[in-house]
């Protein structure tokens, strides 16, 4: 499998399989969607870098992982759409692989715009590359509302 890296105005990422206008893609956020904070974890006072350093060890949410695996097994594509900064691409891919989370594409924010703006660009990119974006799985009400405004279930 060949990985193609890309960089846009508000995002960076990697595409493991090409877009396909005959396929549905589902987008998953990482933090607080695919990951679960350990009981008692408090990120109050942590910098973003400290939070992302700690997140390397967060467990995956088994129910969300199972959902992603089920969607992939029926032939749908999986995209990871996260506001994590671009510098966290490799470690995020490592975490996804370690937790057996399937993905065809991964997109991260370049940090120059608010995360919600970057997430909207990610969803637009997916709409351009696939038949449709089936669902956005995300913990942010702002991102969920933005997806609905684009006609995407969330």
Please place each PLM-identified region on the residue numbering.
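Conserved Lys-Pro-Asp/Glu-containing loop-to-beta segment of HAD-superfamily phosphomonoesterases
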Residues: 119-142, 147
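Alpha-helical substrate-recognition element adjacent to the catalytic core
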Residues: 19-114
């Amino acid at each position: 499998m060949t990985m193609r890296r890309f960089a846009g105005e508000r995002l960076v990422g990697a595409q493991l399989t090409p877009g396909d206008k005959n396929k549905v893609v589902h987008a998953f956020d990482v933090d607080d969607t695919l990951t679960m904070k350990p009981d008692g974890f408090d990120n109050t006072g942590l910098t973003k870098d400290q939070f992302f350093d700690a997140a390397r060890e967060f467990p995956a949410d088994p129910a969300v992982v199972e959902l992603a695996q089920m969607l992939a097994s029926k032939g749908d594509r999986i995209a990871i759409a996260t506001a994590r900064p671009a510098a966290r691409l490799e470690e995020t891919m490592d975490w996804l692989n370690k937790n057996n989370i399937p993905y065809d594409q991964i997109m991260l924010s370049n940090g120059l715009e608010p995360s919600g703006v970057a997430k909207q660009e990610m969803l637009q990119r997916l709409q351009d590359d696939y038949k449709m974006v089936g669902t956005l799985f995300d913990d942010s009400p702002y991102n969920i509302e933005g997806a609905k405004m684009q006609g995407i279930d969330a």
